[in-house]
Amino acid sequence: MTYNEKIISMNNDLLDHQHKELFEISKKLSLMNQRHVGTKELKIVLRELLIMINRHFSDEEAFMREIEYPYINHHTRIHRKIILEIEEIIISEAKFVNIMTEKLNLVVQDFIFKHTAKEDSKIVKYYEEKFKK
């Protein structure tokens, strides 16, 4: 798995940095899949993931409001769906650490690569059309 800055650049330093941080958390989850991890270590990474993803979504939604992105409501619903999916995995797989880390890793990777490439790129396109003429 590699981090491709061109795919997920938002033309916003804060959001781009957060994407990199989420990528690093995804790497931690991936490494946890390859070895036995204790619940204490897992809780630290889960806390880091939830804090970062909520902070990122909040900052990204503020950016969308700032640029008056017309599809903010749709994009915000996608953010809520991602958070709910993460929370459901944590609840449903609480007793199965390896399954939980594997599923969470897939969701986070999907968010980082697919969501940013598909949905966040729409924000970038809107921003560039509106402000970089």
Swiss-Prot record:
Gene3D superfamilies reported in the protein's UniProt record: Hemerythrin-like
Give UniProt keywords alphabetically: Iron, Metal-binding, Oxygen transport, Transport
Concerning NCBIfam families, the annotation shows:
hemeryth_dom
Annotated residues for binding of Fe cation 1: H19, H56, E60, D120
The family database entries (SUPFAM superfamilies) matched by this protein are listed as:
Hemerythrin-like
Q: Does the keyword DNA-binding apply?
A: no
Q: Which family does it belong to?
A: Belongs to the hemerythrin family.
The protein's matches in PROSITE patterns, at most eight in alphabetical order, are given as: HEMERYTHRINS (PS00550)
Q: What does this protein do?
A: Oxygen-binding protein. May be involved in a storage mechanism or for delivery to oxygen-requiring enzymes. The oxygen-binding site contains two iron atoms.
The reply on keyword DNA-binding is: no
Entries under Pfam families matching the protein: Hemerythrin
Q: What is this protein called?
A: Bacteriohemerythrin
Organism, by scientific name, is Campylobacter jejuni subsp. jejuni serotype O:2 (strain ATCC 700819 / NCTC 11168)
Gene Ontology terms for molecular function = iron ion binding; oxygen carrier activity
Q: How does it assemble?
A: Monomer.
Listed InterPro entries: Bacteriohemerythrin-like, Haemerythrin_Fe_BS, Hemerythrin, Hemerythrin-like, Hemerythrin-like_sf, Hemerythrin_metal-bd
Binding-site positions, Fe cation 2: E60, H75, H79, H115, D120
